[in-house]
Amino acid sequence: MRGLDGKTFIVAGGATGIGAGTAERLAGEGASVTVGDINITGAKATVERITTAGGRAIAVEFDLADEQSIQNLVDRTIDALGPIHGLHNVGADLSENNLGRDTTVLDTDLDVWHRTLDVNLLGYVRTTRAVLPHLLKQGAGSIVNTSSGGSLGTDPMHVAYNATKAAVNQLTRHVANNWGAKGIRCNAVMPGLVMGETQERQNDQQLQQMFLIAAKTTRLGRPADLAAVIAFLLSDDAEWINGQVWYIGGASHMRQ
């Protein structure tokens, strides 16, 4: 893809799943990658796969809920890999103690709301605030946020998670609208059912069958499916695409 080779990107949430797949895809295209995650063991494993394949990457432990750790993520990237050209926000609290308790508005405790907002939404705000000034200084850059098909209102559960993802869609458009004329692109992807994201999805056979029927496809999503689209949106091949929120999950959300 055009404009990835020799560039530097931060994957904020690259220990597993879509984030790990994106980090590996970017490195495979010749980019240098910082794999940031609260799960530093997973981040280091991603980096090991990248470097073993001949790529360039570092692992940095950080927390989307901790502004100082995000600044450290940015500083470490610049010190080790050079100027930042793009950011992929993919982290979220998918733990059983948080997402597992996120049900309906009547039954979801406020501590789940606070935690979900702090990580899934404000975490993206924090990373954007930390990286955007560097992109503006260079006169160009790309941000790709991870949303969810649940932001479209089709999931009757996970009220807090889906609300934050709807807000991520608006944050994406806000950045594109305000800084597009200064060379900044910001887009988002809404993954369909991607295996490897949560253990719940791995085990729920009924959910998988429902998705296959709705998506009119022969298989479930893989991290590499999303990674290809995210890498494209970060690349110069997508320089005419800004402020868009793309659903990537078969044909279950066809639009005219």
Regions found by a protein language model. Give the residues of each.
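Canonical Rossmann dinucleotide-binding motif of NAD(H)/NADP(H)-dependent dehydrogenases/reductases
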Residues: 2-34
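Residue(s) in the substrate-gating loop at a strand-loop-helix junction
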Residues: 148
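Active-site helix of classical SDR
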Residues: 128, 164, 172
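Short, small/polar-rich loop/turn modules that mediate ligand/substrate recognition or access, typified
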Residues: 82, 180, 185, 241-243
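Short C-terminal tail/terminal secondary-structure segment
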Residues: 153, 213, 231, 242-256
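Substrate-binding pocket helix/loop in short-chain dehydrogenase/reductase
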Residues: 97-117, 199, 211
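Alpha-helical segment proximal to the catalytic Tyr-Lys
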Residues: 133, 177-178, 239
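Catalytic Tyr-X3-Lys loop
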Residues: 85, 106-125, 144, 161, ...
